[in-house]
């Protein structure tokens, strides 16, 4: 289950 991308961590 993939966790949502953290808003403060760029891709």
From Swiss-Prot:
It comes from the Eukaryota. The modification Pyrrolidone carboxylic acid is found at residue 1. It is found in: Secreted. Its main location: secreted. The keyword Chaperone does not apply. Keywords: Hypotensive agent, Metalloenzyme inhibitor, Metalloprotease inhibitor, Protease inhibitor, Pyrrolidone carboxylic acid, Secreted, Toxin. Disulfide bonds: none annotated. Belongs to the bradykinin-potentiating peptide family. This is Bradykinin-potentiating peptide 11g. It comes from Bothrops fonsecai.
């Amino acid at each position: 289950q993939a966790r949502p991308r953290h808003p403060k961590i760029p891709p």
